[in-house]
């Protein structure tokens, strides 16, 4: 279909297309969050890396790229033999795009269930959730990290010590707060876990 559209657009600047989608809601389905960990020297303290693997359409940008990024970090850490101070937990979340029927707030259900049902004991142990969302989205010459208020000053200091990042994003590299409701870090934040995400808005 894409090739047909490309050919048609060679002849005209604008074309009209009709999209006919057949989608079905299947209630009472089970989804699974997939987690792994690299044990740290202080196993009672954890850093959570999260991304979601469910998607609308093909999901390359939202959010399979983030899952691949997260797994790449895990693979590199394991191959290096490095033992972190804090246990690092990697969690590929389900049901971020949609997971609740008959609600105005139907997204981020997998992360909500992860922290409020499956692992409420993480609260007080996870010192930070680094959530990855749409990391391949081109922002041109600017980059932002969206964070909870408590980590803004720390992250600003951290960014000031990364001159290469400033070169990569000369227009702007900054921290913005607060966390928004659009991604899984929100569920972690409302549970009391300090959270941050690459800003994609």
Over which residues does each language-model region extend?
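Acidic active-site catalytic centers that drive phospho-/nucleotidyl reactions
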Residues: 54, 62-63, 133, 184
């Amino acid at each position: 279909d894409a090739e047909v559209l490309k050919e048609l657009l060679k002849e005209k600047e604008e074309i009209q297309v009709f999209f006919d989608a057949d989608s079905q809601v299947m209630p009472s389905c089970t989804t699974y969050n997939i987690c792994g960990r690299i044990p740290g020297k202080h196993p009672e303290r954890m850093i959570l890396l999260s991304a979601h693997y469910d998607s609308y359409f093909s999901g390359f940008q939202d959010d399979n790229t983030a899952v691949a990024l997260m797994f790449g970090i895990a693979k590199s850490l394991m191959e290096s033999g490095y033992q972190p101070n804090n246990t690092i937990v990697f969690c590929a979340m389900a049901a971020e795009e949609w997971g609740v029927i008959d609600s105005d707030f139907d997204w981020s259900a997998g992360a909500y269930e992860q922290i409020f049902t499956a692992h409420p004991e993480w609260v007080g142990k996870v010192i930070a959730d680094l959530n990855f969302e749409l990391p391949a989205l081109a922002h041109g010459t600017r980059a932002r990290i969206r964070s909870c208020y408590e980590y803004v000053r720390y992250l600003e200091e951290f960014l000031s010590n990364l001159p290469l990042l400033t070169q990569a994003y000369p227009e702007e590299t900054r921290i913005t707060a607060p966390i928004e409701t659009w991604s899984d870090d929100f569920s972690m934040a409302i549970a009391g876990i300090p959270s941050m995400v690459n800003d994609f808005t």
